[in-house]
């Protein structure tokens, strides 16, 4: 039977048990010593694909570690799982759906059947619709109610309808097309809409309402606020269609809102929100960078898809990163993973990967609903470049937790200023080096002696300057951020998450935990506004409701 119908006890597999024994043998493994003993270690534990270079030599592994981790991937049936996903089998078991975000980046001429229907013509039909719309807006042919061309596009969406598109449009800002500015409105916080709308003119603004169901609370509330603002600024109901379009599978609701049917871009239930930037949800990306660059983004992701399907596991970038995550999370006690981009334009990648990883693998039951046998997804956190060095890197270096990290850095800057980029790149490398090397007590004492301190002061200060080292990290290098390379990078992390879900036996493509808060939120709201008099289910929530009602004005 297919792997997803027979969730396994991964801890009972021979490779898992061998890894437990190997972990004990690696207790005193020193990366410092490993590099000193093997001049080829960097070559052995690095690889290139799809415009990305991965150095994973600064990890608590040797060749036996990698071999055993690869055996684990083989024993959980990873190759069959990969084939199942790409061929359209139902691997989202709890919702009875295939998982086919990869279909969105497949080239013209490919065939892929879902329920006996080839979906690829429809995929490329929507891509052509995107191309046509973007062309009309960029050429000034799509005009607002005053017949002026559109200058600003506001994407109204949250979660996957926001994080992925925001990441890509910001990361590819050097590729931005002139004449159209893209903005994002996600949170149901009036201050966000206030600050955004203060810099817009209704007559030249186009809103994209991105919601698969067209009933996402935050998105609908913001869409209604945008509509009210548009009318207050001089727009009319009759001309509303010029200023609002939608990406949704609920055409009726979008039409009822006032959006013309021809301006509604479809979504499919086999594309999850956090995997949807490749679909019409990526419309703001195409508007920001142009459809030619958007298609390059898709092509880059497709090359990673090919690598993922065909490369042997020991040379497969997403598989190796996934296995390293399992190694640290399940055998070394790591509970979080840091994403550290050394590039201003990539500053939002951590937010996207938080949703991608934590919403996918934050699960506590196997695909059949029984409890998991081991820990699953880690906390994903981090931030941009040198800023982190002056904030939380201290904990990475001298804290008590083992926190693996991914450093992401380009070789070439779009905006060279003197020798800034050389220093940025040097800082990235030196941070990973410092995590690995650390500083011994002897080195700390010698350093203090060189500064002229007496022995009594050295004895007091040296312990504080000792840095354990042996902290693992990966370094991902790109020559220069481009649509194609960014597509490959994001797709790589998508596949990494999937691989880990297969190993743990969980479903990476549902998110039932998100739904509970939505359901409870309705009752809390009704109690806040006084339309429901019954007390909340617990005293804490009711107390906080009472506190709000006693002090809120308006």
From Swiss-Prot:
It comes from the Bacteria. The active site is at 359 (proton donor), 390, 518. GO terms for molecular function: carbohydrate derivative binding; glucose-6-phosphate isomerase activity; monosaccharide binding. InterPro entries: G6P_Isomerase (IPR001672), G6P_Isomerase_C (IPR023096), Phosphoglucose_isomerase_CS (IPR018189), SIS_dom_sf (IPR046348), SIS_PGI_1 (IPR035476), SIS_PGI_2 (IPR035482). Its main location: cytoplasm. Pathway: Carbohydrate biosynthesis; gluconeogenesis; Carbohydrate degradation; glycolysis; D-glyceraldehyde 3-phosphate and glycerone phosphate from D-glucose: step 2/4. The keyword Cytoplasm applies. GO terms for biological process: gluconeogenesis; glucose 6-phosphate metabolic process; glycolytic process. GO terms for cellular component: cytosol. It catalyses: alpha-D-glucose 6-phosphate = beta-D-fructose 6-phosphate. The keyword Isomerase applies. Keywords: Cytoplasm, Gluconeogenesis, Glycolysis, Isomerase. Its EC number is 5.3.1.9. Gene3D superfamilies: 1.10.1390.10, Glucose-6-phosphate isomerase like protein, domain 1. CDD domains: SIS_PGI_1, SIS_PGI_2. Belongs to the GPI family. Catalyzes the reversible isomerization of glucose-6-phosphate to fructose-6-phosphate. This is Glucose-6-phosphate isomerase. It comes from Pseudomonas putida (strain W619).
